């Protein structure tokens, strides 16, 4: 992956967009002086690709033959001016705010922080890449069939607020491997239970990609509820039975399709 062909690409849509021949990458920044796209292989080896095209503050590049499952992040060179909110540092791998899938998690290594703990005014130049999630190029292809939102009138709605993991974790008729996952919620046993209650919509507590707070991790605990999102366009990878290589997106879509087929709407908290 050392010889990367690059085309100018386009500024929109933001994030990573695969079109069948390659992937367009675009990142918005008003203050960046230079942006690099970091690509990672299965072993974590990194290749940096300069993003030299800029339109309306959107830095962009198209990479032929770079496709589904590619791990990536951004590195931004620019002002270091914490008092004005600018902490640009190319040693920090930045998450794509428009990513649709993530692999891995934040492990709260000191390199994840922009500053040194002993001197908060000092810039921390340790590379954070080994300690943060990588965005993943996901597949835009999915067979929705004849899917349509049930569109139940509000006065007829029965909404069940639920936690994907909690709702499916102990259901005796859901296979062990599917408990706590999107696929578990799509299982016939889960759907039949909801239908028996007369439920017309499920309101899912946070399913966006989120992090486990450092103070919880230090105590061997986890952020159960998920109200700490870092990727609003990506389904949380730990709720996927299929893994976090982008398959979580397909699994999430399959869950929505199955619920819709049962006449159940899906609302995100």
Regions found by a protein language model. Name each.
Residues 194-221:
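Carboxylate/His-rich catalytic cores and anion/metal-binding grooves
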Residues 28-34, 66:
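Short proline/glycine-enriched turn/loop motifs at strand-loop junctions of beta-rich domains
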Residues 173-184, 214-261:
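Aromatic- and acidic-residue-enriched carbohydrate-binding clefts of CAZyme catalytic domains
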Residues 158-160, 202-204, 266-268:
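Hydrophobic faces of well-ordered beta-strands that scaffold small-molecule active sites
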Residues 165-202:
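A conserved hydrophobic secondary-structure block that centers on an alpha-helix together
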């Amino acid at each position: 992956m050392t010889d990367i062909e690059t085309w100018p690409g386009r500024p929109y849509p933001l994030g990573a967009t695969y079109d069948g021949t390659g992937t367009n990458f675009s990142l918005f920044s008003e203050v960046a002086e230079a942006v690099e796209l970091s690509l990672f292989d299965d072993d974590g080896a990194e290749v940096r690709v300069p993003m030299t095209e800029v339109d309306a503050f959107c830095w962009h590049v198209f990479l032929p033959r770079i496709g589904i499952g590619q791990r990536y992040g951004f590195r931004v060179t620019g002002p270091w001016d914490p008092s004005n909110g600018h902490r640009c540092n190319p040693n920090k791998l930045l998450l794509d705010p428009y990513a649709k899938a993530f692999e891995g998690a934040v492990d709260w290594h000191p390199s994840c922080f922009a500053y040194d703990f002993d001197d908060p005014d000092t810039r921390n130049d340790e590379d954070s890449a080994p300690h943060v999630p990588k965005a993943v190029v996901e597949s835009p292809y999915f067979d929705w069939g004849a899917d349509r939102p049930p569109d139940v009138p509000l006065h007829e709605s029965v909404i069940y607020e639920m936690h994907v993991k909690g709702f499916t974790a102990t259901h005796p008729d859901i296979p062990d491997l599917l408990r706590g996952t999107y696929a578990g919620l799509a299982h016939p046993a889960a759907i039949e239970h909801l239908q028996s209650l007369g439920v017309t919509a499920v309101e899912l507590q946070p399913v966006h990609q989120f992090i486990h707070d450092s103070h919880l991790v230090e105590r061997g605990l986890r952020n159960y509820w998920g109200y700490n999102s870092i990727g609003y366009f990506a389904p949380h990878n730990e709720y996927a039975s299929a893994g976090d290589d982008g398959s979580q997106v397909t699994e999430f879509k399959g869950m929505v399709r199955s619920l819709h087929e049962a006449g159940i709407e899906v609302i995100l908290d």
